[in-house]
Curated annotation (Swiss-Prot):
This is RIB43A-like with coiled-coils protein 2. Belongs to the RIB43A family. It holds the Pfam family RIB43A. The lineage of its organism: Eukaryota, Metazoa, Chordata, Craniata, Vertebrata. GO terms for biological process: flagellated sperm motility. Microtubule inner protein (MIP) part of the dynein-decorated doublet microtubules (DMTs) in cilia axoneme, which is required for motile cilia beating.
């Protein structure tokens, strides 16, 4: 039967503690899910922060585009409603004109399809002056017509009245047509003015969005630079504190003489003594200083590299903003040139149409009326 001594218990506890520390160390190094040793956590944090900033910027841009699309849809709906109302008014005016000035009773061929023609028809002969008395009807013979001159004068007056009436109707129709064209031109000009105002509003909105994005990026760059400076300063202070603690602690300034263990003179306490001489300690100190300098140099290179990338991003954003402004300026110039060309073309067409109307609307003279009914046949 074995008896557990205090030394054996102490040794067993130390071995269990060492095994536990070893298991914890294996978990920190070989666990792929929770391992942070050998990885750049600072770069991971920067990547996560950049991804969040990108998501926020994309969300703001999408919201701005959605608001702009909503505004454009509203303007298109208003323009569509205005055009529908104009079409209804034009159709109503056409219907009123047809009902008031294009009645079936006013047609020249209405007597051929008049349902009351039999009721309106006259007898075979009313008097000697009846115009329907022909030679074949034997109702009136040559020399018996005493109202020949009066009838001829009446025919001329009637033809004159008909012509004047037709001329007045044509003039009125031409005036109505010119008025409709004038209203159409005014409506088109109003639509063009509304489109120009919308383009100006769109340009100002884009300028405000670009200015906000530029200010946001500038603030982010300043904040990132200040944060890196503070982190670097804190890291340097922590490194100096760690170096000072190591230089003045028991780990590096311990007694070079071996500390005998309670289990024998050939044993030493591992957590207190490493068994190194003065030369080995100086070599370790020199290596540590060199590693510190190398780490500081790498950090400085990384900081310089980050500043270069930030400067490149700022320059690229500035160049893209300048390019977008140039494109907007070119679009405005093209739109202005197109408007001027359309206005000149409209003026030329209006002058040409006015000349044609003036040339085709001359007043008839007495010679024009005297050429009708010059003979008996």
């Amino acid at each position: 039967m074995e008896v557990a001594m205090s030394k054996d218990l102490q040794q067993e506890a130390n071995l269990a503690k060492k095994r536990y520390i070893d298991l914890c160390r294996q978990g920190r190094i070989f666990d792929a899910r929770n391992r942070i040793i050998g990885g750049d956590t600072q770069a991971w944090d920067f990547q996560v922060r950049d991804q969040k900033i990108k998501e926020i910027t994309d969300k703001a841009r999408h919201e701005a585009f959605a608001a702009e699309m909503k505004h454009n849809d509203k303007v298109m709906c208003m323009a569509h409603d205005r055009e529908q109302r104009h079409r209804k008014q034009l159709c109503r005016a056409i219907n009123d004109f047809q009902q008031n000035f294009q009645k079936p009773e006013t047609r020249r061929e209405f007597d051929l399809s008049d349902p009351l023609a039999l009721q309106k028809e006259l007898p075979a002969r009313i008097s000697d002056n009846d115009m329907r008395n022909t030679i074949s009807g034997m109702q009136k013979f040559m020399g018996e017509d005493l109202n020949f001159q009066e009838r001829r004068r009446f025919q001329k007056e009637q033809s004159r009245e008909w012509f004047l009436q037709q001329h007045g109707e044509r003039e009125k129709a031409r005036a109505d047509h010119l008025l409709a064209e004038h209203l159409h031109t005014q409506t088109r000009l109003k639509f063009d003015e509304t489109a120009r105002e919308l383009m100006k509003l769109e340009g100002s909105t884009r300028k405000e969005v670009c200015a906000a994005v530029k200010a946001f990026n500038k603030n982010q760059v300043v904040e990132l630079t200040e944060r890196k400076r503070q982190e670097k300063q804190q890291e340097q202070e922590d490194n100096m504190t760690e170096i000072t603690n190591l230089l003045h602690g028991d780990l590096l300034s311990e007694n070079p003489r071996p500390v005998a263990s309670s289990f024998g003179s050939h044993r030493v306490v591992l957590d207190r003594w490493k068994g190194m001489n003065r030369e080995q300690l100086e070599e370790i100190w020199f290596t540590q200083k060199r590693q510190i300098q190398e780490k500081l140099r790498l950090q400085e290179e990384e900081r310089q590299h980050s500043m270069d990338w930030d400067l490149r991003r700022i320059r690229k954003a500035h160049a893209s903003l300048l390019h977008e402004r140039q494109q907007q300026r070119l679009l405005r110039e093209q739109r202005r040139a197109l408007d001027c060309s359309n206005l000149n073309l409209a003026r030329q067409q209006y002058l040409q149409k006015k000349q044609m109307n003036t040339a085709s609307s001359s007043q008839p003279t007495e010679d024009y009326f005297s050429q009708f009914n010059t003979r008996s046949r």
